[in-house]
């Protein structure tokens, strides 16, 4: 088996200021007026170059077609292509899954995507690209179902039209600490039980974030918010939008920008429902962030600490730490010129383990 080694180039520069590697020009993107539903405001992002992304396979597409297989570490026998060696069986691990991309297309994975099944439901911890016809690839994941370590299914799938909401994504992407993720899942489930009282008994009967989000009453509440943005996607196609900036209770918390309108479309339902879920579990009164603030948030991509990880010829992932925010950029190296596939930015200040929550998630 031809293993590709992930070469990590780590730069820790304190006191210096620089732009995130491969970040788009700050003047490229323009934020449009928001569409607001309750305490959730969505600011469309237009402008910037359009790249051909049709060749990128999403996790949903890959699992649905059977071209992508996800399994517990140590359960790969029979899944690897004939003639390929099988790595030693190290047994199932909470923070490790193994993925094989049998397709002819590169696979795009986004932080926050949830895979259900196996011994526990997991959330993917970081963006990455998996090359076509890959051998087994270790995935960095975090459990979002404390308390279960018994196989519910031999196969992994994804939650249909679901992605972990921003408040759950933050500890996985930034803290990278399992206990922090479990703590946030517990808090989120409690808040969701209050937001959807009929679902409270079922939510409290299980520790599963995925099951809670799939509860009919929770689906109804999340869907009622998300439905207000159904028509927005049609308008965004017309103007070639590539991303969105998100505000809850008047606080800007997140931005997602893609390489193409087509890619934004593919993730639209997942993203909108994740923001809607966060608006329900962070319900409070507040003003509305203005358009100028949303534009400023999107433009501030500089920081004083940067971590770069790269798989040569496949992708580069950059994390930039700024004053009150984190920027994550996934760059494709599989074609020339290289290009930014996905940019995610979150408002963030301090450590969740020290009791300081992400900006905009404070209660």
Predicted regions and their residues:
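Bacterial N-terminal signal peptides
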Residues: 8-17
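Intrinsically disordered, low-complexity segments enriched in small/polar residues
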Residues: 20-107, 112-363
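Positively charged n-region of N-terminal signal peptides that target proteins for export
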Residues: 1-7
């Amino acid at each position: 088996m031809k293993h590709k080694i992930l070469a990590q180039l780590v730069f820790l520069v304190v006191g210096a200021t620089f732009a995130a590697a491969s970040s788009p020009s700050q003047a490229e993107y323009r934020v449009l007026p928001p569409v607001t539903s309750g305490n959730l405001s969505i600011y469309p992002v237009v402008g910037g170059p359009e790249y051909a992304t049709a060749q990128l396979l999403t996790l949903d597409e890959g699992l649905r077609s059977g071209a992508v297989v996800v399994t517990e570490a140590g359960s790969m026998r029979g899944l690897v292509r004939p003639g390929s060696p099988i790595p030693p069986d190290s047994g199932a691990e909470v923070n490790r899954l193994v993925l094989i991309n049998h397709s002819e297309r590169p696979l795009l994975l986004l932080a926050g995507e949830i895979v259900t099944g196996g011994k526990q439901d997991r959330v993917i911890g970081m963006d990455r690209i998996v090359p076509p016809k890959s051998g087994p690839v270790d995935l960095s994941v975090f459990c979002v179902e404390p308390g279960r370590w018994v196989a519910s299914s031999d196969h992994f799938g994804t939650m249909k039209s679901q992605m972990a909401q921003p408040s759950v994504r933050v500890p996985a992407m930034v803290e990278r600490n399992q206990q922090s993720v479990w703590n946030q899942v517990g808090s989120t489930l409690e808040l969701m039980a209050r937001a959807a009282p009929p679902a409270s008994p079922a939510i409290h009967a299980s520790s599963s974030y995925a099951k809670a989000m799939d509860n009919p009453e929770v689906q109804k509440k999340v869907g009622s918010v998300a439905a207000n943005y159904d028509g927005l996607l049609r308008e965004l196609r017309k103007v070639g939008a590539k991303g969105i900036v998100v505000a809850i209770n008047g606080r800007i918390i997140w931005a997602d920008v893609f390489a193409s309108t087509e890619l934004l479309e593919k993730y639209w339902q997942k993203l909108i429902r994740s923001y809607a879920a966060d608006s329900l579990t962070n319900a409070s009164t507040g003003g509305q962030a203005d358009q100028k603030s949303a534009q400023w948030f999107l433009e501030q991509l500089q920081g004083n600490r940067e971590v770069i990880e790269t798989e040569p010829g496949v992708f580069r992932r950059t994390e930039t730490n700024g004053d009150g925010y984190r920027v994550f950029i996934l760059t494709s190296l599989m074609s020339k010129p290289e290009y930014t596939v996905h940019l995610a930015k979150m408002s963030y200040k301090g450590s969740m383990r020290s009791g300081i929550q992400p900006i905009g998630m404070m209660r």
